[in-house]
Amino acid sequence: MNCACVDIGTNTTRLLVAERDDGRLREVVAVRRFLRLVPDAGGQIPPDAVAALAAIVAAHARMAQQYGVSDVHVVGTAAIRAASNRDELCAAVHSACGIPVEILSGEQEAELAFTGALATLATPPAGAIGVIDVGGGSCELVTGTVADGVTWWRSMPIGSGTLAARHLRSDPPELAELAEARAEIDVALEGVDPPATELVLAVGGSATTLAAAGGGELEPASIARILAVLLAEPAAEAAKRLGLHVERVRLLPAGLLALEAAWGAFGQAPLQVARGGLREGVVMRAFGGRS
C-alpha cells in the first residue's frame, strides 16, 4: 500500500509517494516545485502565491492518486505557521484538492524529521543520534535514539529562505551580508547545547544539495568550497556550474551557514546526509510508526 505526503515549505512544495518495506520506507516517486511563500509587511502570504500554492498542491494530490494513493497527507511548516492569513491559505488549498492542511508545530516538525531520517537508514545506530533539519523558514535540532525516540529538540527561525530574505540582497552575496546572516544564526544558537551524539544526520534541501554539489563529502572544508563557488559568480552561472536549480542556488549560502553552525553545536560529530526527513516522517506516522 502506498501513502503520500505533500510538504508545504517556505521555498518548495514537495510530494513524496512511498511504500513500507520490512519496516523501512521505499520511495515510489518524489516531486518538488519551487514556490517562495514570502509574507508581506503585514505578515500575509500574497494572494497570487496562495493561488499558485493551491494549484501546486492539487497537482501533487492528483499525481499521488495516479500511483494508487488514497491516503494523502498535506502538512505546512514555518511559513504557514507564521502567516497572518494561514486560515485563508489552508481554506484555499482545501478547496483546490479536498484535503485539509495540517499545520505542524516546531516540536512536531522536529519529531517527524527525526522519524523520517531514521526510516531510510539501513542500520540505525543504537546510541544517540542527532538530526539537523535546515528548512526554508526554520531550523530544527533533534537528538534521540531508536529505542526512545526524540529526547531533546529545538526549533529556531533561521531557515535558508528567512535568512536570505533578511540579509542576502546581492547576487552573488557579499561577505558583509554573509556576516549579517551568520550573526543572526549565532544569536539563535546561543545557549543551544544538544546532548552528545555518535552521529548527526542532516536532512533538508541545503544538506542534500551540499552532498550532491560537494561530491558526497560532508566536512567543514566541503561547505567552505561550495560557498566559495556561490560567492564567485551570479546565481544563474553558479546554478549551471553546479547543476542545480537557480532558486536553490540563491538560498544555498544561507542554508549552508545555518547547517555549518548547527553542526558546530553538536561538536561536529560525524555528519551524514539522510535520504529521509519530514515527509518520510509523516508517511511513517500514517503507517503507524513513531510520531
Where are these regions (language model features)?
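N-terminal basic/disordered segments at the start of proteins
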Residues: 1-26
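Helical "lid/coupling" subdomains associated with nucleotide-phosphate turnover
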Residues: 3, 17-20, 38-66, 79-128, ...
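A short acidic Gly-Thr/Ser loop motif
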Residues: 7-12, 132-138, 203-206, 277
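Broad gene-expression machinery/nucleic-acid interaction feature
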Residues: 12, 30-32, 129, 136-138, ...
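N-terminal glycine-rich anion-binding loops that anchor highly charged ligand groups
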Residues: 24-32, 67
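Flexible N-lobe loop architecture of eukaryotic-like protein kinase catalytic domains
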Residues: 70
